[in-house]
């Protein structure tokens, strides 16, 4: 995970990223690299490439920091280059995200390899081509791998890696540092893993519309109100394992396996994409979502993704588990100061307001002020020794009184810092005073918190254990 100076390096050199092709996926890569603290060079021949990338960046800056409980590294530097040669010169990772035409990609690789370092990773975002196809006629074939992400790249963590074992392992390490989930595909196959599954659902959806069984809205509703929610946190096979009951997966297959012989799907057939069918789909889609601009839909999507992934963090499950790991690394890189003297405030928390915390008034809901202050207390207590290990021994602190004063609005994307002072430490009693400030140093809220040390077995208050008592005594 990169620090404020972006930690992953080759030797002592900070990694540099290049992006060739700045469309939806390429722009997403640019945002992911920049917001994780790395410098990026971009080449794109489209006259509006700069505008489109900046629009993607605007969405990413608004949503990506809200995934985490700590601030992200200082944003890297973005440079638009007039040629491939200039963009890839000195790059450690080159992301190719140009149109899905094999001949164009191979021509691009020839120019890239003529100017990039020989040990650089050339990672194609292709959703369908195999590495062996991309590598044909390349001067250094193994240098080219597939790193297939999902839109929006700055939020969704999955990247499918296909190619040389040594290169993909190295790529996986870099992607993990970027907060992504690299999935190394065991053998190359057209469309890799995820897109083969998506293609099956897409084909069936086209038939349902073609045959007049369902509209675009009804198909989307079947996904987002049903199995889509299950898939988002358990995938397909884990979901079916539950369906098998106590007898497990084998029972599920025995029970539902015969259904595979029934005419439930048309997976090997595709309806002819006639003008009539295309117009039908487009018209239904316009009725469903035409009231929103694409930019509005992107922001709705991003807000929902942030909210869902943050919910998964609570149970440390799926994508939430990955985000919690990233938070631990970010926390280690921004270790808070701890008080030396009674009443002296120290910074206990730095974070960004996620869009999912904003209510109907357009600002952070009051319930989340308490959440931020609670996190600040946890950080301070952990620094004094009352951490998870201490809790596992059967001791902790309970809040028995808390007062918050709301002094200024906090909006989505605002960077907040909490400064905490211990104002009383007598036996089992602990009092804290918090101040929440925004990036301009304005005090947004204050909080007075009274805690009691508790024995978790008896559920009654008691004096702190010797290590904690000694740490508190040093503050007197």
Regions found by a protein language model. Name each.
Residues 380-430, 444-446:
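Hydrophobic beta-strand-centered segment that forms part of the acyl-chain substrate-binding groove
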Residues 337-400, 456-476:
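Hot-dog-fold acyl-thioester-processing enzymes
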Residues 2-7, 11, 36, 216-339:
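NAD(P)-dependent Rossmann-like dehydrogenase/reductase catalytic/cofactor-binding core
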Residues 28, 153-162, 178, 187-213, ...:
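Active-site-proximal catalytic alpha-helix in oxidoreductases
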Residues 45-48, 63-122, 129-130:
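Rossmann-like NAD(P)-binding element
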Residues 121-195:
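Rossmann-fold dinucleotide-binding core
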């Amino acid at each position: 995970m990169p620090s404020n100076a972006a930690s992953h390096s080759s030797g002592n050199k900070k990694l540099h990223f290049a992006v060739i092709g700045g469309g939806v996926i390429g722009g997403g890569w640019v945002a992911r690299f920049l917001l994780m603290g790395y410098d990026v060079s971009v080449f794109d021949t489209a006259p509006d490439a700069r505008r489109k990338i900046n629009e993607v960046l605007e969405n990413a800056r608004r949503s990506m920091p809200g995934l985490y409980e700590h601030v992200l590294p200082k944003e890297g530097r973005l440079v638009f280059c007039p040629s491939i040669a200039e963009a890839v010169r000195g790059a450690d990772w080159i992301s190719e995200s140009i149109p899905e035409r094999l001949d164009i990609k191979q021509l691009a690789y020839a120019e890239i390899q003529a100017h990039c370092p020989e040990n650089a990773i050339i990672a194609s975002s292709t959703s369908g081509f195999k590495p062996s196809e991309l590598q044909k006629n390349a001067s250094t074939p193994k240098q080219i791998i597939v790193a297939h992400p999902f839109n929006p790249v700055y939020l969704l963590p999955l990247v499918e890696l296909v190619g040389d074992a040594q290169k993909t392992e190295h790529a996986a390490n870099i992607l993990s540092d970027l907060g992504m989930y690299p999935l190394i595909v065991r053998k190359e196959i057209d469309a890799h893993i995820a897109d083969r599954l998506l293609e099956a659902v897409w084909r069936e959806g086209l038939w349902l519309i073609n045959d007049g069984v369902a509209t675009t809205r009804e198909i989307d509703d079947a996904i987002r109100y049903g199995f889509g929610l299950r898939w988002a946190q358990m995938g397909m096979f884990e979901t079916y394992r539950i369906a098998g009951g106590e007898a497990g997966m084998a029972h599920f297959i025995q029970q539902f396996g015969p259904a595979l012989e029934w005419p439930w799907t048309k997976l090997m057939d595709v309806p002819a994409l006639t003008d009539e069918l295309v117009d039908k789909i487009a018209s239904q889609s316009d009725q469903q979502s035409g009231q929103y601009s694409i930019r509005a839909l992107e922001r709705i999507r991003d807000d929902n993704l942030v909210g869902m992934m943050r919910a998964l963090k609570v149970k440390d499950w799926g994508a939430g588990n990955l985000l919690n790991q990233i938070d631990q690394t970010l926390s280690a890189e921004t270790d808070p100061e701890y008080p030396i003297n009674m009443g002296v405030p120290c910074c206990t928390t730095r974070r960004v307001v996620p869009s999912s915390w904003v209510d109907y008034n357009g600002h952070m809901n009051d319930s989340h002020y308490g959440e931020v202050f609670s996190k600040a207390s946890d950080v301070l207590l952990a620094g004094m020794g009352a951490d998870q290990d201490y809790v596992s021994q059967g001791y902790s602190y309970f809040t028995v009184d808390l007062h918050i004063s709301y002094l200024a609005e906090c909006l989505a994307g605002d960077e907040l810092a909490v400064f905490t002072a211990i104002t009383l430490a007598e036996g089992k009693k602990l009092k804290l005073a918090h101040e929440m400030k925004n990036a301009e140093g304005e005090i947004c809220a204050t909080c007075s918190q009274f805690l009691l040390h508790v024995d978790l077995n008896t559920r009654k208050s008691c004096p702190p254990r010797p290590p904690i008592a000694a740490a508190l005594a040093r503050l007197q």
